[in-house]
Amino acid sequence: MAGTLEVTEDLCWMPAGWVFDNVLERIADVLYPQDSALAELLLASRTDANGGYLDLRDVNLETLGLLLETANSAYGCLARAGIQEGVSPEFYAGLLTQFQDLCDMLRTAQQARMEKREQQAEKHRGTHADDAAP
């Protein structure tokens, strides 16, 4: 069974269930000291808990940034640690690739939301500049 993590309307991460669970657990471990509720949400989204579904499409920019930061940190820990117990050596490279794909999707979503926020701020400033004109 595959897990499904909706990042945006256009970005959806769908790895094998064991990869989905493994990655969410690793991110939750890093995330827990900073945001225990969000870490619990990740853990509650594993395949054995709810069938492996998590929807991040409506999270705010700050939460998305925190997820990206902790995902990158968890990825770095996994990459430095190398092959560990419970992961077959032949699947390790695929796990890293899938994990990196999620990090890339989170980064893309963050950049898109930052650009949207900047455009809205520019539009807002332009509207108020018109109000101040003589």
Question: What are these language model-derived features?
Answer:
Residues 1-134:
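Acidic (Asp/Glu-rich) sequence patches and key acidic residues
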